[in-house]
Every structure is written in C-alpha cells, then in structure tokens.
C-alpha cells in the first residue's frame, strides 16, 4: 500500500450517527488502526500498564482520566501498535479544546500530524428515532434496529441466535440529554478543526453506502 493511501484522522459524530459502521470501513480500506478511546482505556487497564493503573485509580474514585494520560495512551498506540503505521482513525477523542491542542502538539512532535477531522452530521430527531430502536448483541457488538435493520428472528442475533439487548441509556430522555451534552462539548472542537483547515462535514442521515462514498470523497481518496 502506498503512503498516499495512509490516513490520519479524527472521526466526530453524535451517538447514533454511524461511527460504529464507518470506522471499520475506514480501518479496512486504509489498513489503519481504529483508536477508540474507551477501548484503549480498557485495554491499558487490562494489561496493567503504568498508564492503565493510573487511569484505573482515577476511575475507581469516580474521576475523569486526565488529558495527559489520554494523549500518552494514544502516543503509546502510535509507538507500539503495528496497525498505526498506515495511520489511525481516532474515535471519541478529543472532546475538549485543551485535549485537541495537546493531541496536535504530540502528533506534530511524532511527525504524524492530523490530516482530516470528519464530522458525521445528523438531526437530533432522526438520531432519537435511530437509537431508541437499537438492539445490541453484547458478545460481538453487532447492532440491529427494530425498524431500520431488524434481526431475522425477533430479538435474536442472526449469527448465534443469542438474545439481543436494548441498552438502558438508549431511551429517548436519556438520549436527548446525551445529545445536548454532545453538542455543547463538540461544537468548540469542530470550530477548532475548521480554523486549522482540516474539518469536513458529511451528511450522515443518508444510507450508509452514500455516507461512505461521501467520506472517501472528503478524504480525497474516492
């Protein structure tokens, strides 16, 4: 794979915008690492690394893991994860301007600055309809939807036949609160990347295949 086919990007989008669909597409297309911050945290804690132990101590006390720990975890992935040599898709980070600034500084020091920040944009009303019908197969992470993508057999996973669950935070009121928090938190980040010139917005209310084509177009890789 040529270096022109590597990718270094941030994927931004509210719950239900389809990041879980598009991130694996990006990962496969560019042979890049999908760095979801929640997964990285869990992995570092499970491995008992210095960063993981520091993070666990803070989380056990109900605190938020510091920006420095998060940026160092990403740096650790870039250094030690072979999948990062063709680039990375950052998902769930940065969430604040100080995080974005620290991330930028670290990536520039590593000689791997961000190339794109893609924002998946969807109206809140559509997100509520999408998410409140969402069904998850816990063991695999496969997701279905009561209306848009129902399983072949009601409430059962197509592959294993095991029961599907609806996440407790997928009810409408909880979701509206999450979306309000998301917008308050994310708008400054979007402005930050607009100023640095790497932001691109994609209408994620379209069918997944159209969204995918649009993402490739925005990346200049179609």
Curated annotation (Swiss-Prot):
The protein's Enzyme Commission number: 2.7.4.3
InterPro entries named among the record's database cross-references: Adenyl_kin_sub, Adenylat/UMP-CMP_kin, Adenylat_kinase_CS, Adenylate_kinase_lid-dom, AK2, P-loop_NTPase
Record field: catalytic activity: AMP + ATP = 2 ADP
Predominant cellular place of this UniProt entry's protein: cytoplasm
Pro-piece positions: 2
Compartments where found: Cytoplasm, Cytosol; Mitochondrion intermembrane space
GO cellular component: cytoplasm; cytosol; mitochondrial intermembrane space; mitochondrion
Phenotype on disruption: The phenotype of disruption mutants is pet, showing that complementation by another adenylate kinase isozyme occurs only under fermentative conditions. The disruption completely destroys the activity in mitochondria, whereas in the cytoplasmic fraction about 10% is retained.
GO molecular function, one term: ATP binding
Region (NMP): 36-65
Residues passing through the membrane, by range: none
BP term (GO), one: AMP metabolic process
Keywords: Acetylation, ATP-binding, Cytoplasm, Kinase, Mitochondrion, Nucleotide-binding, Transferase
Region (LID), start-end ranges: 133-170
Top enzyme category: transferase
Gene3D superfamilies with a match to the protein in the record: P-loop containing nucleotide triphosphate hydrolases
Modified residues (N-acetylserine): 2-3
Protein function: Catalyzes the reversible transfer of the terminal phosphate group between ATP and AMP. Plays an important role in cellular energy homeostasis and in adenine nucleotide metabolism. Adenylate kinase activity is critical for regulation of the phosphate utilization and the AMP de novo biosynthesis pathways.
Notes on the domains: Consists of three domains, a large central CORE domain and two small peripheral domains, NMPbind and LID, which undergo movements during catalysis. The LID domain closes over the site of phosphoryl transfer upon ATP binding. Assembling and dissambling the active center during each catalytic cycle provides an effective means to prevent ATP hydrolysis.
Family: Belongs to the adenylate kinase family. AK2 subfamily.
Quaternary data: Monomer.
Name of the protein: Adenylate kinase
Source species of the chain: Saccharomyces cerevisiae (strain ATCC 204508 / S288c) (Baker's yeast)
Gene from which the chain derives: ADK1
């Amino acid at each position: 794979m040529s270096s022109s086919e590597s990718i270094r990007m941030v994927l931004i989008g509210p719950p239900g915008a389809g990041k879980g669909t598009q991130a694996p597409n990006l990962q496969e297309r560019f042979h890049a690492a999908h760095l979801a911050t929640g997964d990285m945290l869990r992995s570092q804690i499970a491995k008992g690394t210095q960063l993981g132990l520091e993070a666990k101590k803070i989380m056990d006390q109900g605190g938020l893991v510091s920006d420095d720990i998060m940026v160092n975890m990403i740096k650790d992935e870039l250094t030690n994860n072979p999948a990062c040599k063709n680039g990375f898709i950052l998902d769930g980070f940065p969430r604040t301007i100080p995080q974005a600034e620290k991330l930028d500084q670290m990536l520039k020091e590593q000689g791997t600055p961000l190339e794109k920040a893609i924002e998946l944009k969807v109206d809140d009303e559509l997100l509520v309809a999408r998410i409140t019908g969402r069904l998850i197969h816990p063991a695999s992470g496969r997701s279905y939807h009561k209306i848009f993508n129902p399983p072949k057999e009601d409430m059962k996973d197509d592959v294993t036949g095991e029961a599907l669950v609806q996440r407790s935070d997928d009810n409408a009121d909880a979701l509206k609160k999450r979306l309000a928090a998301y917008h308050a938190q994310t708008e400054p980040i979007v402005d930050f990347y607009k100023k640095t010139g790497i932001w691109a917005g994609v209408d994620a209310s379209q069918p997944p295949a159209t969204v995918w084509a649009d993402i490739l177009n925005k990346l200049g890789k179609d």
